Amino acid sequence: LEQEGFSVEMGLAGMPTCFVASYGSGEPVIGILGEYDALPMISQKALVPVRDPLVEGAPGHGCGHNTMGTAGIAAAIAVKNAMDE
């Protein structure tokens, strides 16, 4: 996001991966949330079509939650580009 011209504040709420990115000033104000959460007991190795946990009993991502952060960043960049036109 910094490469796209956003101001990025990292490490919010005591979490090193938490951030807020801002672009521009004035109105409209548009907010986009990207979140990752984990569900219990679904740790899974990538690209393995059968149950094969990375860590037995550990949480993992499901239901598309693993794509929300990437989609949020793409949306923020698209909105910024539209605002700049």
Label the model's feature ranges:
Residues 1-61, 70-85:
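Acidic/His- and Gly-rich active-site-bordering loop/insert found
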